[in-house]
């Protein structure tokens, strides 16, 4: 006897997971990031006014510190920003699609061999960090018959990127590669700007001045990052590169002047009561000393909450700390809700993981890192919501 096979008709994807509808992805994920574009713009204006008459450029590398360059860069442009810094060429290519043509896009890591034409096609301005990068960019300029815009970076003490100071004469030799390069900016980067009294700041500025003595007149100069802006006007030169301060992060005294930009919440998946002696999480790293009420939150180390926070971190609800219990997993973490009224939290509710009660600086201290990393490592599964 044959059995009639029923044809399988899957439901439309939209009916199951309406992720393409604005604001709906958060209904189906474990957590959400709320980014205030208005606060980003306000922070830009604060720093712009602070450093005037120097220009204020925005550092939006690493997807605007993980918060979404596609939304943040246009908001900064609308606030008056016209110069943007990224780390890699592909980031500049992506921004070129969404920013007007008068936005200058600087690529801090310079150019990989063979990437010169792609940079030219994207209208990017490479930050040239070596003789080889200068020579490669100049070869393309000679091939197209005109000098090509670039920035030139010198290493004054960071030991990371840039030509050594002794190459200043080479870099600006009118018979050398500079003949086919249009220098838009000469820059260096401060290593200890977040320690205002450190003697290294003055040493780097003095080294920068010696380099500038070789430079042609009229080329813009840049030394300060967010923290460097608070070292005094001698460090501002013509342009400051502002990153952390835009996002409300601790960059020396600027943190007190900046508006908070980001909040992260996690969704309660389940609550439970456990008896004394119950193990919690992988390895039973925690055993309940007495009866406890626990809530499982749909955020884990894949979303930016690393395992090293397991024993020290926590969430917040209505201003009250909810300590983490047991080891943080890839997709979830557990908090102690024993101090809350029994019905205070239920499945679907949100707890604060990052915000006014759990600041980036607190998470950085607990995780033995810096607040920049706390923001930059936020996972792509967290739904990003933007408010103006």
Question: What are the functions of these language-model segments?
Answer:
Residues 25-27, 31-42, 52-214, 218-222, ...:
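Active-site-proximal beta-alpha core segment in soluble small-molecule metabolic enzymes
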């Amino acid at each position: 006897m044959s059995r009639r096979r029923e044809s399988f008709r899957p439901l439309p994807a939209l009916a199951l997971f309406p992720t393409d509808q604005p604001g709906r992805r958060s209904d189906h994920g474990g957590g959400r990031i709320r980014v205030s574009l208005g606060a980003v713009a306000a922070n830009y204006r604060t720093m712009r006014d602070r450093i005037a008459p120097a220009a204020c450029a925005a550092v939006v590398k690493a997807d605007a510190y993980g918060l979404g360059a596609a939304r943040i860069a246009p908001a900064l442009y609308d606030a008056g920003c016209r110069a943007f810094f990224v780390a890699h060429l592909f980031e500049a290519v992506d921004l070129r699609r969404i920013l007007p043509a008068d936005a200058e896009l600087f690529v801090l890591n310079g150019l990989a061999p063979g990437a010169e034409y792609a940079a030219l096609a994207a209208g990017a301005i490479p930050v040239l960090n070596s003789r080889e990068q200068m020579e490669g960019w100049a070869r393309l300029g000679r091939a197209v018959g005109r000098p090509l815009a670039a920035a030139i970076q010198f290493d004054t003490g960071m030991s990371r990127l840039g030509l050594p100071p002794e190459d200043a004469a080479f870099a600006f030799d009118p018979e050398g590669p500079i003949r086919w390069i249009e220098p838009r900016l000469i820059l260096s980067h401060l290593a200890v700007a977040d320690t205002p009294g450190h003697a290294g700041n003055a040493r780097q500025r003095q080294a920068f001045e010696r380099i500038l003595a070789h430079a042609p007149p009229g080329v813009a100069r840049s030394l300060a990052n967010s923290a460097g802006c608070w070292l005094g006007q001698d460090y501002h030169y013509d342009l400051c590169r502002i990153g952390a301060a835009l996002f409300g992060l601790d960059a020396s005294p600027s943190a007190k002047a900046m508006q908070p930009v980001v909040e992260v919440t996690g969704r309660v998946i389940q609550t439970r009561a456990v008896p004394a002696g119950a193990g919690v999480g992988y390895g039973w790293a925690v055993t309940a000393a007495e009866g406890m009420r626990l809530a499982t939150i749909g955020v884990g180390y894949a979303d930016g909450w690393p395992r090293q926070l397991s024993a020290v971190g926590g969430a917040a609800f209505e201003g009250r700390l909810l300590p983490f219990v047991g080891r943080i997993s890839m997709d979830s973490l557990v908090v102690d809700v024993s101090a809350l009224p029994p019905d205070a939290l239920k499945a679907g509710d949100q707890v604060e993981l990052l915000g006014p009660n759990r600041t980036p600086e607190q998470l950085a201290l607990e995780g033995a890192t810096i607040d920049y990393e706390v923001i930059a490592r936020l996972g792509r599964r967290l739904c990003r919501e933007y408010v103006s």
